[in-house]
A protein has these predicted regions:
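Generic beta-strand/beta-sheet core signal
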Residues: 2-4, 136-138, 145-147, 181, ...
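Short solvent-exposed loop/turn micro-motifs enriched in small/polar/acidic residues
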Residues: 126-128, 171, 187-190, 224, ...
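Dual-mode signal for accessory low-complexity, basic/Gly-rich regions
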Residues: 205-269
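Internal helix-turn-beta structural module
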Residues: 244-317
Length: 318
C-alpha cells in the first residue's frame, strides 16, 4: 500500500504560495502515482473546515486545473471509497456533541444499505424512463430534461455514508429558478441561501447574500461551471438535517441536489468543468416543502415519496 498524509494547514500554505507552474508539476506527479494504483481509499478529517477560506480564488483555480485530471483518473479507473473521520470539528459544524456525532456517524455509515437497494433501483428505473423533471417549492420553479441519461443508485459501494440516486440534466435543457435552503461549504467558504436562475442550461444569475461575489467567481472558473452536471435525490433515511458537510448533506432524505460543474462519466451529459459543486435543497414540510414531478407525475411531495414501493427511502421517524 501507498500512504499519503495531508494536513489542511499545510495545504493552505501550499495553495497560498505555489505558482501555477509549480501546481502543474505537482499535478503531473500525482497523476502518475494515481495511474499506478488499483484502488484508492480516502479518509478525511480535520479541526477547521474553514482553513482554506482565505486562499485567493485564482490560486484555488490553478490548483483545481492541475489536480482535476487526478480526480478524474481516480473516479474512472480505480476502485475507490471516500469517507470522513468523525472528528470534533465535524461535530461542531453539525452543532452536535462529539459523542452524539460519533453515534450518528456510525449509524449512517453502517446502516443496512442492502435493504434500501431494491427501492433505489426502482427509483433509478423510473428516472431512466422519464424525459422531463419539474421541481417546485419556495423560491423554486425549474424544469429540465433527463432523457437518455443513465440513473445511478448509490447504496454503499463508494461513498460512506451513502444514499442517493443521480443522473444529469441534458446540458442545455434547464430553465427556471431555484433556491437552495441548505448551507454549503465550498473551497473553505461558507454559503447560505444560494439562488440560481438558469436559461437553456446556463446559470445566468446567481446570488448568495454577502457571498454573491465569491459565488460568481467560482461559477466563472470555466464555461462548464455555469452548467449542471448532476441531478440527484437524497434518500438516506437516517440523515434528516444538514451537517455542513456535503458527503452527508447530499444524502439527506427528502432532499435533492443540483450540481454546477463536471458530470460523472457514468451519467455523462457532456459537461466538463474543474468544479463539481453539489447544492442541496431539503423539501420536507419542516423545511418549507416542495414537489418533484417526472413527466408530469408527482413522485415526491414535501420530501416524501408518493409510491408505496419507495416508502423505505422516506425520512426515518425514529
Amino acid at each position: 500500500p501507498f500512504l499519503r498524509l495531508n494536513q489542511s494547514r499545510l495545504n493552505r500554505e501550499m495553495l497560498s504560495g505555489a505558482t501555477e507552474e509549480q501546481y502543474g508539476i505537482i499535478g503531473r506527479h500525482r497523476l502518475a502515482e494515481m495511474e499506478d494504483m488499483d484502488a484508492y481509499i480516502e479518509i478525511r478529517g480535520g479541526g477547521n473546515a474553514f482553513e482554506l477560506s482565505s486562499v485567493p480564488q485564482e490560486n484555488m483555480a490553478a490548483a483545481m486545473k492541475a489536480l482535476n485530471p487526478v480526480s478524474q483518473r481516480r473516479i474512472r479507473h480505480t476502485r475507490w471509497c471516500g469517507l470522513r473521520w468523525p472528528s470534533g470539528g465535524m461535530a461542531q459544524q453539525a452543532s452536535m456533541s462529539t459523542e452524539e456525532f460519533e453515534d450518528f456517524y456510525f449509524r449512517t455509515c453502517l446502516m443496512d444499505y442492502a435493504a434500501l437497494r431494491p427501492a433505489m433501483r426502482k427509483l433509478a428505473a423510473m428516472m431512466e424512463k422519464a424525459e422531463y423533471v419539474k421541481i417546485t417549492g419556495p423560491g423554486t420553479d425549474i424544469s429540465f430534461s433527463i432523457k437518455g441519461l443513465p440513473a445511478i443508485p448509490c447504496a454503499g459501494e463508494c461513498n460512506l455514508p451513502d444514499g442517493e440516486v443521480f443522473t444529469a440534466p441534458v446540458i442545455d435543457s434547464a430553465n427556471g429558478h431555484i433556491s437552495f435552503n441548505t448551507p454549503s461549504l465550498f473551497q473553505g467558504i461558507p454559503f447560505d441561501n444560494i439562488r440560481l436562475t438558469l436559461k437553456n442550461g446556463l446559470v445566468v444569475h446567481a446570488e448568495a447574500g454577502d457571498k454573491t461575489g465569491e459565488l460568481n467567481t467560482i461559477l466563472d472558473t470555466d464555461p462548464g461551471a455555469r452548467r449542471l452536471g448532476e441531478f440527484a435525490f437524497g434518500v438516506n433515511p437516517a440523515i434528516t438535517r444538514p451537517m455542513r458537510n456535503i458527503l452527508f448533506d447530499e444524502k439527506i432524505s427528502g432532499s435533492f441536489h443540483l450540481t454546477p460543474g463536471q458530470a460523472y462519466h457514468v451519467a455523462d451529459n457532456g459537461n466538463q468543468s474543474r468544479i463539481h459543486w453539489d447544492m442541496v435543497c431539503i423539501q420536507t414540510k419542516a423545511a418549507g416543502g416542495g414537489d418533484i414531478y417526472l413527466d408530469g407525475k408527482l413522485v415526491r411531495r414535501n420530501g416524501l415519496f408518493t409510491l408505496p414501493e419507495l416508502a423505505i427511502l422516506n425520512p426515518s421517524l425514529s
